[in-house]
Amino acid sequence: MATLGIKAGENVLMVWAQPSKPATLKDYAEELSSIVGTDGKVSVENVDRLLLSSHSASTFDCAVSCVLADSSAVHSLDTLAELARVLKPGGKLILEEVVTGAEAQRERTSEKLVSTLKLSGFTSVTEISKAELSPDALSAIRTATGYQGNALFRIRMSASKPDFEVGSSSQIKLSFGNKAPRPADKPAPDPNTVKMWMLSANDMNDDDLDLVDSDSLLDEEDLKKPDPSSLKASTCGEAAGKKKKACKNCTCGLAEELEQESKEKEKTNLPKSACGSCYLGDAFRCASCPYLGMPAFKPGEKILLDNKTLTDA
């Protein structure tokens, strides 16, 4: 009992599991009550009923779970989370559990138990003791769980709840008094080094400076304006037995040439009037005008005549 670290005046939660004997459970609860005294309190809960209890959050200073020699239970994540909830910030948890040297269907290794405690929110997880099970305890666990191996140990672990509640916040004070020292100023560049990479305007008039005139590199043929026809590719728009067609993104002028030819062809196909007044309406049209009876239209506008109209004309 002295190894549990329970002090007078503390509120202690004692969790037990089957197959603990009622007499053993009563003696242990009375022993805890004598330690905490009248200023403290000991609450007893079954591990399977812990999640159904109505304990308020941050109630107990210490929780002792399944430490009786004749009790055995596997602490689930929900059970450990509930123990963390009812403990006060900084509260202590002491638990015992049967572990195995290899992964089993129900029992787990000590490393797995440590990981489960940390996932439940506990810190400072420490192994206090580890002992082999007695033949009677081993037989009872085999009967209850169906475990067939011999590598079973009873391990006692201690863990602590952090000094803060889940979801709590705290203001962080930032001090701007001690600022980081400013870096030393960069040295000024050497003027001689800068001159090596610059061409002074005064150097342009030096007789010793020999610059090449780019125009002198061109001959008379290079300066002549090229003939547009010479810029056209030899095979551009040429296809035996096919209509002349410009290339996509044409740059030789064939596309513009074909467009101009198309516009001129449309102009020649426009209907011609002998009097030149057909577009004004029936009042200005001749008796044999093919546009007779049609509304006025703009000069040059394309008008389609049906076969009946042409026959009547």
From Swiss-Prot:
A motif (Cx2C motif 2) lies at residues 286-289. [4Fe-4S] cluster binds at residues 275, 278, 286, 289. Coiled coil: none annotated. The twin Cx2C motifs are involved in the recognition by the mitochondrial CHCHD4/MIA40-GFER/ERV1 disulfide relay system. The formation of 2 disulfide bonds in the Cx2C motifs through dithiol/disulfide exchange reactions effectively traps the protein in the mitochondrial intermembrane space. The C-terminal domain binds 2 Fe-S clusters but is otherwise mostly in an intrinsically disordered conformation. It holds the Pfam family CIAPIN1. InterPro entries: Anamorsin, Anamorsin_N_metazoan, CIAPIN1, SAM-dependent_MTases_sf. Residues 275-289 are annotated as: Fe-S binding site B. Component of the cytosolic iron-sulfur (Fe-S) protein assembly (CIA) machinery required for the maturation of extramitochondrial Fe-S proteins. Part of an electron transfer chain functioning in an early step of cytosolic Fe-S biogenesis, facilitating the de novo assembly of a [4Fe-4S] cluster on the scaffold complex NUBP1-NUBP2. Electrons are transferred to CIAPIN1 from NADPH via the FAD- and FMN-containing protein NDOR1. Belongs to the anamorsin family. It is found in: Cytoplasm; Nucleus; Mitochondrion intermembrane space. [2Fe-2S] cluster binds at residues 236, 247, 250, 252. Residues 6-172 are annotated as: N-terminal SAM-like domain. Its cofactor is [2Fe-2S] cluster; [4Fe-4S] cluster. This is Anamorsin.
